[in-house]
Amino acid sequence: MSLTELFNRHEFLARHIGPSDAERAEMLAAVGAPSIDALVDQTLPADIRLNRRLDLPSPQPEAEALAALKAVASKNVVNKSFIGLGYYPVLTPTVILRNVLENPGWYTAYTPYQAEIAQGRLEALLNFQQMVIDLTGLEMANASLLDEATAAAEAMAMAGRVSKSKSTRFFVDSRVLPQTLDVMKTRAKYFGFELVQGHPEEAGNGDYFGALFQYPGEAGDLLDLTPHIAAVKAKGGVVAVAADVMALVALKSPAEMGADIALGNTQRFGVPMGFGGPHAAYFAFKDEMKRSAPGRIIGVSIDAKGKTALRMALQTREQHIRREKANSNICTSQVLLANIAGLYAVYHGAEGVRRIAARIHRLAAIFAHAVKEAGGKLVFDRFFDTVQVDAPKADAIYAAALAAGYNLRRVGKTVLGVAFHEAATESDLAKLIELFTGKPADIAALDAAALDAIPAALKRESAILTHPVFNTHHSEHEMLRYMKKLENRDLAMNHSMISLGSCTMKLNATSEMIPITWPEFANMHPFAPREQTVGYLELIEGLQKQLKAITGFDAISMQPNSGAQGEYAGLLAISRYHESRGEAHRNICLIPQSAHGTNPATAQMMNMQVVVVKCDEAGNVDVADLKAKAEQHAANLAALMITYPSTHGVFEQGIKEICEIVHAHGGQVYMDGANLNAQVGLTRPADIGADVSHMNLHKTFCIPHGGGGPGMGPIGLKAHLAPFIANHVVAPVPGAVEGQTAVSAAPFGSASILPISYMYIAMMGAEGMKQATENALLSANYLATRLSEHFPVLYTGANGRVAHECIIDLRPLKAASGVTEVDVAKRLMDYGFHAPTMSFPVPGTLMIEPTESEPKAELDRFIAAMAAIRAEIDRVQSGAWPADNNPLVNAPHSKADIAGDWDRPYSREQGLFPLPYVLENKFWPSVNRIDDVYGDRNVVCSCPSTESYM
C-alpha cells in the first residue's frame, strides 16, 4: 500500500457505517439487487437524481478533524462574562458533566414514549418538574420548553386559550428581556394579538387578556409584582412571570405574588452558556390550566403489579395527536439539559443552592456598596445579582474591562451593567471594583459594610427542595450511584438499535461529541462582542456552506432550535414573502393527510387555514386531489407542506409535478426535512422544487436526541425567501434584514451543538455522505424484505422498494388474534429492543428506520425478535395461549417476574429470555406495563414519596 493509502482519509466512514463490504453484498443479495447503484435506481425517481458529486471538501480523519476544529475554536476569545441578559457562566458539577452530558447512556436515548424502558430519565425529569414547582410555588410544571423566549410566547398563547377576557391585547413589561420581546412580537402578529408595552404600574390601566412581567427586570431591578398582577387578574387577564431560576432561590415565588404561569431559563443550574444554547426553559402553571399547557408533562401512574411508575401524561394535548388543534407545535424539547438542571438541584440540595444564590447576591451587594462609597451612581438600589452603574466614563471603564478580560453590558452612552454569577470569584470582584472606582478594594471591609439589596417583602420565606431526592445525594459517591441507577433503567443506543421511523437514530460518534464541552465553545455568551466570537462565526459559516452544498439552497438560517421551530421559521419566511408582494391574504396551507402532526400545528400557529390533501391507496399524495384543491384555493394559496421521501417511507414519483402545481397557483413549497437522511448525495430538496426546508441536525446530521432534546432545525431557503429569515434584536444575524423579528432566544439557536454536525460532514466528505444514504436505503430494504416473510409491508415505491424506512401492517393480525401494536411494542422490550414508531403515520402499524449505522448482526437480531413475536402471535391466534394471558399482553416482563408465583401458560424462560442472545445481554425493564388510563385520571406531576417506589 502507498503512503497515501496508509494515511486513510476515509477511516471515519467505516466507523459510521455499520455493515462491512461483505455484509453489504449479502444484504444486496437478500433484496435481489445486483449492486447498490441498481438499488438506488430502483428506489429514486430518475428525474430527481443528482448526477454529480456534492461540493464538499475531502474527508478528514478523526484526529485531523478534531485538530482543525480546535484551531477554529481557538479563534474565540472567552472573556469572563458579566453581561447577564438571561445567560450566565456556571460551574457544572464535574460528576454530572462526565456521567450525564458526556455519557451515551443519557444522550443517545429517545423521547420516553416507551415509558417502561425510560424510567430513569422520567425520574430525572420528574425531579426537574418538582424543582420548578418548588421554586415557582405553582402546582404543576412541564418537562421543559426550548428557551425562555419561546416559553414566554407559549405563555401568551396559553393565556389566550384560558382567559375569560374578550380582549386581544396582551401587556408586556417594558423590563422584559429584549430577546423575549423579539420572539413574542413574531408570535403575536400571527396569533392576531396586540402587544402593549409598559411599566408594570401601567398594567392595570387597560383591558388585557394576559400579561407578562419580568422578575427581576432585564436591568436587574427588583419590584414587588403583587399589585400589578392583581390589577390584570381583576379584569379577567391571565398573568405570567418570567423569573430568573437562581433568583427564585432567594426571592418570593411568582405564585405568592399571584401569578398563574411562571417561566424562565434553567441554564444557571449547571448548563454552560454555549453561545446561546441548548438550555431547558421551565414552564409552571396552575393545576386548572394543565390541559391547556404546552410541552411534555411527566406524570405518576402504576404498572400492572400496582408499582409506582412514570410516564408522559396528558398526551392528547400534543401535536402528534391533536394536529392543528394542538396547544403547541412543540415536539423535541430540551430533556438532556432539563436533566442536568434537575440533577444540579439534586446534587446541591436546598442548602447548596441557597448558599450559591446568597454568594451571588453578596458579590453584587459588595460591588454596589463599593461603587456608591466611591461616589458612583447606581441606576437602582434593589437587585439580586445585576448592578447598573451610571458612569460618565463608561467608555473608558468598558474598554479597560475588555483589556482585563471582562465583558460588561453596555446600556446607552453612560450606563454599564454588571451581572454576577456562580463562577464569579473574590478576585473578579476586586478587579471589577478597581475598574469602576480607580482604586484597590478592601473586600473584607466592604463585606462588613455592605447591606442586603433584596427588599424584606421580596425575600423567600417558603421552603424549597424538601423532597428526599434533593436531600440525599450530596457526596460524589452517592450522586454517582444515583445517576448510574437512573441510567440503568433506560434503554439507549449504547445498548441496542432504536429503529424509530422518521427519527433517524444513527451513530452519535465520540469525535463529533468531544468539541461541545471545549471551553472555547461552552463558555461563550451569545451577546459577547463579535470580535470575540470569530471562531464560532467561522464554524457557523462553514456549516452553512456544507448545508447549502447538500441541500441546494441559497441561504441557511441557523436560528431555529428544533425541527418544529424550523417549520415555524420556514412558514414565517413564506408569509413574510407573500406580505412583501402585497399578498398577505394568502393563508391556505395544503398538507397531505399522512403528514407529521407538527405540520398542521405549525400552520395553525401561523394563522394559516389547513386544507388536507388525500393520499391514494399506495400511500402517495393524490395528485388529482392536490391539483383540484390548489385550483380551488389559487387566490389564497400560501404553501404546501410535504415530507420527502413521504412519511409512508417511499419516494413518490410525482414529487416534481406536485411542486410545479403549487408554484403554478401562487404557492410556495415547504419540504419537511424529517427524511433528509434518504436524500443526501442522491438528490437535493431545492433541486426537486422546494422553496424552503428545515434540516433536523439531530437526525440526519448526528446530533443525539438526548432523551427528548436538544435538537436543531435550521432552514434552507431559495434566494427569493432569503430576505425573510429571522433576525435578532440584540445580536443581528449576518445576512438577515434589519427589523425582521426572531423565532428563538439566541441568534444562532443552540449553537454549542453545531460542532457535532460540522464534524460529521467534515469526517465523511462528499462520497461518505452519499454512501451513508445508500446504506440507509439498503438497510431499510433489507429489513423490509426479511420482515415481509412474517408481516405485510404496507407501502412500497414504483419498483417495490422502500426508502430509508418501512411500515409493517399489524392490523390483519390484530383482527385475527386480538394482539395489538402496543402488545408488540411492549414485547420487543423483552427482546432488548425499543419499539419502532407506533401507529404513525397509519394506526395499527410499526414504522421502522434502521439507519446506515447499524451492523448487519443487529439488523438480524431485530428480524429474529420480530419473527419470534410473529410465532407468538400465531400461538395466540390458534388458541394455544389465551388472549388475555400470553407473553404479548403481559409484556414487558420485569425483574419482579423472576421470582414468585408463575400462573401463566408459557414458561418463565419464554417470558423473560425468549431467544438465546437475550440471555447473554438482558436489558430489564424496571417496571411492568404501565396503566396509561390510571395516569391520566389521577394526574400527579410531582415527585411521589420514596416509599412508593418500593
From Swiss-Prot:
GO terms for biological process: glycine decarboxylation via glycine cleavage system. Its EC number is 1.4.4.2. GO terms for cellular component: cytosol; glycine cleavage complex. It comes from the Bacteria. The modification N6-(pyridoxal phosphate)lysine is found at residue 699. Keywords: Oxidoreductase, Pyridoxal phosphate. The keyword Oxidoreductase applies. It catalyses: N(6)-[(R)-lipoyl]-L-lysyl-[glycine-cleavage complex H protein] + glycine + H(+) = N(6)-[(R)-S(8)-aminomethyldihydrolipoyl]-L-lysyl-[glycine-cleavage complex H protein] + CO2. GO terms for molecular function: glycine binding; glycine dehydrogenase (decarboxylating) activity; pyridoxal phosphate binding. Its cofactor is pyridoxal 5'-phosphate. The glycine cleavage system is composed of four proteins: P, T, L and H. Belongs to the GcvP family. PANTHER family: GLYCINE DEHYDROGENASE (DECARBOXYLATING), GLYCINE DEHYDROGENASE, DECARBOXYLATING. NCBIfam families: gcvP, PRK04366.1. The glycine cleavage system catalyzes the degradation of glycine. The P protein binds the alpha-amino group of glycine through its pyridoxal phosphate cofactor; CO(2) is released and the remaining methylamine moiety is then transferred to the lipoamide cofactor of the H protein. This is Glycine dehydrogenase (decarboxylating). The lineage of its organism: Bacteria, Pseudomonadati, Pseudomonadota, Betaproteobacteria, Neisseriales.
